[in-house]
Every structure is written in C-alpha cells, then in structure tokens.
Amino acid sequence: MQFKKTLVRLLLFLFPFSAAAQTTYLPLGDKANILIERLEIKSKNDSSLNYSKTRPFSRQNIVIAITQLNKRGVNDLKLSKVDQYNLRSLLMNNIEFGADKSIFRSKKTVGKKFYQTPANFYEVHIKDFDLVINPVIQAIISKESNNDQALYLNTRGLTLRGRIANKIGFHAYVTDNQEKDPLYVRDWVNRRKAVPGQGFYKPFKTTGYDYFDARGYFTFNATRYIDVTFGYDRNFIGNGYRSLFLGDGNSNNLFLKMNTRIWKFNYQNLFMELHSAEIPGGDKLLPKKYAAMHHLDVSVTKWLNIGLFEGVIFGRKDHFDFGYLNPIIFYRSIEQQNGSFDNSIVGLDAKANFDRKLQVYGQLSLDEFLLGEITKNRGYWGNKIGIQIGAKYIDAFGISNLDLQIEHNRVRPFTYSHRDSVANYTHYNQPLAHPLGANFKEFIGIARYQPAPKWLSVLKLIYYQQGRDSSARVFGNNIFLPNISPNRVGDYGYSIGSGWKTNVFYASFLLSYEWKENLFIELNAVYRKQDTKTPPLTSANTSVISFGVRWNVGRREFDY
C-alpha cells in the first residue's frame, strides 16, 4: 500500500495532467509484433521504428511510424501482398489513432452497434472519448502421449481500451482461466509452487489449475517527449525471443513506467512492486520486494542501436526506498549511500540491421564479476554473467514472408541469485529474466512462414543443457536460494553445466488460420525429450497434440 501511495504522489507532483495526446500499448503476444519486426528490418535507413527493445509497443507511435513509412510507398519497402494485408490489419486494430476511420467500416454490422469494424466487437469514437471493447475466448484441447487424462485450456473474459479528452489512456484485460497442463509443466508447478506466467492460483479438479488474470493501466504524456504508465501488467526488454534483462514469462506486477524519447535517445525508467518466493496460503498478505530499472537506447546510426541497462532488486519491510526513484544516477552509488548492497545488475545490448533482410542482436548481463578471476579461468562462483547473441533473417532465400531466427543464450551459475533470498531476481516464484534461471546454455531456432494473408506456420526448435542442483549440493541453478554457505559449497569449480547435468530438446509446429479478424483456429504439435547425463540417469519423452480456437488473446506456450 505504501508503494502505491508513493507512486501516486510522485505522479501528481512531477506530472500535472496538462498532457498532450496519449497512447495505449499493443499486448506482448499481439500478432502485429511480427509485422513491426519485419518493417523495422526492411526500413533499414529509417529510424522511426528503431526503438524496439522496450516492449510493449506504443500503439500511437507505431501508427505514426507506419504512416511515415507509407509515404515512401510499397515498392520502396518491397512489401508483399501478405505484408500489405497485415499492415491494413494493424491500422484497423488501432483505429483510434488513424486519421480516416471510415475506410475500415464493416459491410455488415451486428445490430447496427456491434462490429462497426471487423476488428472490434463494440467501439465508440467521439470528441474527447474513444472506447474499444472485445471478448476474450480461448478453448484448446490436447492429448499427451504418456498421459491418459485429457488436457485443456479454457479462457473467458474481455478486454477494453480507450482515451479520455485526448489526455488519458486506459486499458484493462480480465479473464477467468482453467487449465490442465502436460506432465512436465505440472512438475514445474510442483517444484516452483507457481503456474507459469501467472500469480495466485487454486487447484482445479485435482490436477488442473484455476486462476484469474487481471491486467490494466493508465497512460498519459507528461510532455511531448515523456510517456508515463501506471498499472499492473508485464514488460519486456530486448530484441530476442528471450531476455537476460527482463522477460515476459513471469507474473504481472504493479509498476510505474516513464519513457522519454527525444532525438536519438529512448530512455525508460521502470519501478516495480514484486513478491518474494514465500507464498503463504489463505488470505495473508504476501511479503513484498521492489525493483528499479532503467534502459537507455541510443541510435548511433539509422541502422545501429546500442543500449545500456541497470536494475536493482531490493527487499525492505514493505516500503519502497526513495533513493531508487532517482532516474539518472547509477544504483550502486545509492546502495553505498544506504549502507546496503542490494542485488544490482548492469547490462549492454546492441542491434544492427543489414541489407533490409538481416538483423543481428545481443545482450550482455553482468550480475557480479572479478576480471582477475575471469582470466585465471578457475570457475569462480562470483563471475555471474549472461550472454545472448541472435539473428533474424526475413524473406529468407528470396521467399516472401519466410522469416528465420536463431538465438543462443548462456548464463553462468548463481547469476540472478543473491546472498539475501528476498533480493533474488524473481517475482512470484518465477525468474524475472530467462525462464531457466541460471547455469544453462540454450540454442533456439524459429522459422515463421505466412504463405497467404490468413495462414501462418511456425516451427520452433530449442535445445538446452543445464546443471541442476542435487539434494546434496547447490550448483547455482536455483536462483531462489541464498548464494552463501551452507547452500554454496566452495568458491571455485563452477561452470555452465556443473551439477546434475540435464539436456532438453523441445520442438513444436504450429499451423494457424485466422478465420475472422483476431479469431484463430490452430493446430499445434509439441515433442519434448529430457535426459539427465549425471547418475542417476533418467529419461522422459513426451509429445502433445493440441487443437483449439483463440479470440483476442495471445498464445500460451510452455517452451522450455
């Protein structure tokens, strides 16, 4: 409660509501994200889309950028018919930010008031007020090879967004969900005491889970260059499929976000209220911890972007440390002033676009390290480092809308952990960055092909090797444990894969058909094989076939 009061007072003091036009944001799983990535690479010499590391994307900024790109013409960007279809769909799904709304009118409405455009169930666009309401439905049934029980995912709810007086934007997403997951996911839930990507949950019919997913936020522009968002949702920092700074696979959290975009700079400050690993039952208040992060993007050229990241996780007795509200100074100096070394992480990222077809990106995450120990190569436990490198190749081999992506992630043991378990880099029993935690190396390959406007196929291959902790010794995989004695035994001999070595191969194939706008019929197949290479040797193979529909909601995946 104290954290919420602090943020509200800060908003009122720093940013009086005399704002200009404002925005809402594309959901992280929105279909338009793929198109935005393609347009960014195709428009190599146009920097209007060159700030794609901090997500979700601003609807207003995307529409403005696309409008600017449209002035260059389809031939200049070499857009395929599928791209043009997706571009029209993006503008229709963000109709409140477009100049001409009449071009998207439905030929046939429902009861004259509903589906005035194909994208939205109900919408109002009048002076000083915009409102868009859509249902959210997902119904998926699955069959697992080594499981006699039927698997399913059932989601019902609604989503809405709007603007008031062209000064305040708002968004809400509320769903009720029941799911029964594959056996490897249930094992994950039993170990973590959390449902992937969700917060509080209840058992449902013995082996299922029941949870309520509610998100929402308010936005406004403090000045022409500063966007402010206050709400309860998720954020993502990076250009990869995964992130070593802040991923989107964890639970929603309360946050205040300030994004400053001017000249060649995009600077984001993010303050979050999180929950520690302890999840008591009943109606008890959950113990809280806090995070303060900032990320600076610099467009060195129109095709090269370099970023700096810094974040700190700190535990206080249910109150926010005001020192961390400073949006500029390095957090380590604040820790020293406070007499407390909290869990601080710094990072560097980069992204470069080449030849309108290729993007190369990467991240370097530094939790702690000693340069002398790195050169000695003795496996010092305190060298807590993560590295990501990847590439995207669009219209691969001259085939329109065939997009390939490869990515490699490696994180050393004990990265993201801390001597104080409250300050580990986690939220609601889930990692804040990469879903595997630490002590792993991972290889990802993704192929997306959209041969026609309504059809999409996605092949995904993931292989990772992880050194897991045993019952007798900790090897730096479990980032929830304090990284001090007796959990950590010794200072040396730790490398990626140390411990109970486990290899996992994951493959999935998705075939998706968009029957109506934002209504997808999908068939998905998953194969997963897990082998332990350290005695006692074990092996577990599973395959899952799924079929279902989803409407105005992103796909739910367990790809690890």
Task: Map each language-model feature to its residues.
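Bacterial Sec-dependent N-terminal signal peptides
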Residues: M1-T24
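An exposure/low-complexity boundary signal
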Residues: S18, T229-R234, A507-F509
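Short N-terminal segments immediately surrounding and downstream of signal-peptide cleavage
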Residues: T23-E40
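Outer-membrane beta-barrel channel domains
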Residues: D30, N45-K53, S58-Q60, I64-N305, ...
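Generic structural marker for isolated residues within well-ordered, non-membrane alpha-helices
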Residues: I36, R215, I444
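Active-site-adjacent bridging/hinge elements
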Residues: I36-L39, I226-D233, Y361, S365, ...
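Exposed, low-structure sequence patches enriched in small/polar residues
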Residues: Y211, L304-V312, K317-Y560
